[in-house]
């Protein structure tokens, strides 16, 4: 049987790296993807690439019409919504053309490399834009692992702190455990 496809998930996991060392982010994300693509091209002909929701435009995300509810913010579906946005959230057709971040730019460039390899070398690939993945091995540090920080705050009876949207804590993010992601990809 053919070997299983490599799972390419090169990423500078810490926000500190993303801000202080663009070279490190570029080497890790883009060069890591290129190395994985070459392996897949020469060895098995397919791969799975885990990208990120950070490829979507920050400007477009900030312009999402929101409705404040008692316990959360929701997409205001009564407003005119841009392409790729619905009451279910953001799809793969949402804006990627405007400002995103150095990290998001390298992951979007990696997606383009994957598409080019598929066209040039008949590589078969799956690109999955993950949101927040949290589980074993994630550390409760200021520069990564916000959910781990929240669990620790709850455990030790400390106040939670929120960033953005007026610090209300009403913003909503999907959280995926690595086991669930693995089951999805299987």
Feature-to-residue mapping (PLM):
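Short alpha-helical oligomerization interface
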Residues: 18-31, 99
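NAD(P)-dependent short-chain dehydrogenase/reductase
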Residues: 61-88, 102, 112-182
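Conserved catalytic-core motifs of eukaryotic protein kinase domains, centered on the activation segment
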Residues: 18-24, 58-62, 139
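Conserved Rossmann-fold NAD(P)-dependent oxidoreductase catalytic core, especially the SDR/UDP-sugar
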Residues: 34-100
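Active-site helix of classical SDR
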Residues: 106
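Hydrophobic/aromatic beta-strand patches that form the interior of the parallel beta-sheet core
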Residues: 26, 48, 126-128
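Single conserved hydrophobic/aromatic residue that forms the stacking wall/gate
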Residues: 1-13, 17
């Amino acid at each position: 049987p053919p070997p299983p496809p490599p799972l390419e998930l090169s990423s500078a996991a810490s926000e500190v790296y993303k801000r202080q060392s663009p070279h490190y982010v570029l080497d890790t994300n883009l060069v890591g993807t290129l190395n994985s693509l070459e392996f897949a091209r020469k060895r098995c002909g397919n791969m799975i690439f885990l990208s990120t929701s950070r490829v979507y435009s920050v400007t477009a995300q900030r312009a999402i019409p929101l409705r404040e509810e008692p316990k959360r913010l929701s997409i205001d579906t009564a407003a005119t919504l841009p392409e790729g946005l619905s009451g279910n959230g953001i799809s793969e057709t949402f804006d990627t053309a405007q400002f995103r971040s150095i990290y998001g730019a390298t992951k979007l460039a990696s997606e383009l490399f994957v598409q080019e390899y598929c066209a040039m070398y008949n590589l078969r690939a799956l690109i999955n834009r993950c949101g927040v993945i949290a589980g074993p091995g994630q550390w409760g540090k200021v520069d990564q692992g916000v959910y781990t920080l929240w669990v620790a705050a709850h455990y030790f009876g400390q106040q939670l702190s929120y960033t953005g949207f007026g610090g209300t804590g009403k913003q909503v993010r999907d959280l995926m455990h690595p086991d669930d992601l693995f089951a999805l990809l299987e």
